[in-house]
Amino acid sequence: MKKLNYIFFSLLALLFATSCEEPQVENPVLKTPTSFVLNNPVMQKQYIELTPETTVKLTASQPDYGYAAAADYFAQVAFSEDATEWVEVNEEPYHDLGNIQLSGEELAMAMCKLRGIETEEGYTDEDARAVYVRLRAEIKAEPEKSAIVADVVVLEQVKGYFALKLPGYIYLIGD
C-alpha cells in the first residue's frame, strides 16, 4: 500500500509539471518605426545666448521598434521647419532619451555651418533667431530599416557665436 501511495503521488506531481501547450519563445523582431516624438523643451520661448558652457536639454520618446532597442540619437538643426538642409549637431550619438544635453559650442558650430561661415573674417554678429531642432534615430545593426526622424521643435531666440575650429599653426625654428 505504501508503494502505491508513492507511485500515485509521483504520477500526480508529474501531471502538474506538464502543460497542454509548449511555451512560446518569441525573439524580438525589429519593426520599421512609424512614430518618434521630440518633446517641446522647457527653454523653447526663452532667450538662449550660446557659450561653450551652455547646454540645451531635450527629451523624447523612444521610436516604436517593437521592443526596447538601444538606438543611437543624433540632433539636427536648421533655420526653417521645412528646410532641405539639416546639420547634425553631435558627432557622437546620444543614448539617453530622457536627458539629451545639446552643447552650446556644438549648436553654435552647426549654426555657423548653416550660415556658410568658414573663416572668422566671414562671421558677422546677428540678433537671436529661431533654430529648428529634430532628432534622428537609428540602430547600428540595421540603419536602413530603423532610421526615423522625430518631429521638429523650435527654439525661438538663440544667439550664436563664432565657434568653428580653425586650423592651428606650427612654427618651426631652423632652415
PLM segments and residue spans:
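Positively charged n-region of N-terminal signal peptides that target proteins for export
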Residues: 1-5
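Sec-dependent N-terminal signal peptides
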Residues: 9-10
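C-terminal motif of bacterial Sec signal peptides marking the signal peptidase cleavage site
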Residues: 15-19
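Insoluble glucan recognition modules
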Residues: 21-76, 83-85, 92-175
